[in-house]
């Protein structure tokens, strides 16, 4: 890991702040989520939502999406320049669900974007509070990560669907800033770069002229973000090659796919943060909790504590299992879609099932679904223990990259082995390691061959009782070492479609 001296913590990225001490960070993150909470309360008033309607996660998501849309400057500009019939570029909206005569009914609301921006700024001391908006984007991204597989997107860019554990944050909008870049997986960055290179190959003018210069700067910035996620010198050296290429093309795409595969064993450092739906912060603010005064962290006990005593509802379709819906949202709240199920189960205190065994579809309800048959139920988002979120990828204490089963990107800093199917992964590396990156490729393959599935990652790190807020007594869980726990493995989850 590069010396922490050069890195900002992700709370600092989250709040756009420069170096601050721990208390300042806790206060500014607290200010951010408090602002989200105040905004949510105000929106519930504006929309005349009852308490129960305000606790409905579908309503929370609609309100979050509306404010994100109101602040999406590029899209707003585009909509105003390309007016489409029957759509007002100055308005945004979505489904709001209300309880009428013992049934849930859907009502489509339209809201003025300018008005939404005013309410948001008012809740955030008159500021734009971009950090809060990014926070909502990351929550939506984590929800997508837990709900959908990206097999199609992977195949389209020439990657292998088994690399799905590298795809964290693949649905984050480009405008999500440093905090967004921190939570993107290696596969997500590789995919963005491949798309860019392909455009350059197909469009002669992509790298040319004034626009091309900006494109080039963006390309190199993305390369540096990806380089920063790798933890071995050889992987980083290969990224330098990709970044410095005069005219990126197929050779670079090959190198990037090679690097993505290598990240299945030599894992990248990807940040994880617990981002909760706006209604959860709203409930806490409404009950008189002062986030800024108390301080808040996205990677410590605070989100667990908040979820211990917030009651959130969800609409449930006729053949869905409410417990499974709860698991989906729990995983999204803790950014645990790519965590080992053994670890998640231990922390949650109930067995966490792989995606393919869940009887639940996504959280959002399509506009053509029948509301007559919709029920609602309380989401069970509590946990038995809490653990610190990691940004490391879990490399072993031998200071060389550790083994990782084909689809795990650790979320929690908890001791475990990362079992993996070496044969499966290494099979992807047949072929000729030649060309200008051959020595680096050889070195990377050697490191991968030397990693052992039984090596222990996060040595000595454990989970904590919910009463242990200072993290003084780590409980190091023991797992069945042979049994790996990948969430998407051998699975039939729906695809994510924009």
Curated annotation (Swiss-Prot):
One of its GO terms (cellular component) is helical viral capsid. A motif (Bipartite nuclear localization signal) lies at residues 198-216. InterPro entries: Flu_NP. It is found in: Virion; Host nucleus. GO terms for molecular function: RNA binding; structural molecule activity. GO terms for biological process: symbiont entry into host cell; viral penetration into host nucleus. Residues 1-23 are annotated as: Disordered. A motif (Unconventional nuclear localization signal) lies at residues 1-18. The keyword Cell membrane does not apply. Late in virus-infected cells, may be cleaved from a 56-kDa protein to a 53-kDa protein by a cellular caspase. This cleavage might be a marker for the onset of apoptosis in infected cells or have a specific function in virus host interaction. The keyword RNA-binding applies. Signal peptide: none annotated. Keywords: Capsid protein, Helical capsid protein, Host nucleus, Host-virus interaction, Ribonucleoprotein, RNA-binding, Viral nucleoprotein, Viral penetration into host nucleus, Virion, Virus entry into host cell. Belongs to the influenza viruses nucleoprotein family. Homomultimerizes to form the nucleocapsid. May bind host exportin-1/XPO1. Binds to viral genomic RNA. Protein-RNA contacts are mediated by a combination of electrostatic interactions between positively charged residues and the phosphate backbone and planar interactions between aromatic side chains and bases. Encapsidates the negative strand viral RNA, protecting it from nucleases. The encapsidated genomic RNA is termed the ribonucleoprotein (RNP) and serves as template for transcription and replication. The RNP needs to be localized in the host nucleus to start an infectious cycle, but is too large to diffuse through the nuclear pore complex. NP comprises at least 2 nuclear localization signals that are responsible for the active RNP import into the nucleus through cellular importin alpha/beta pathway. This is Nucleoprotein. It comes from Influenza A virus (strain A/Gull/Minnesota/945/1980 H13N6). The gene is NP.
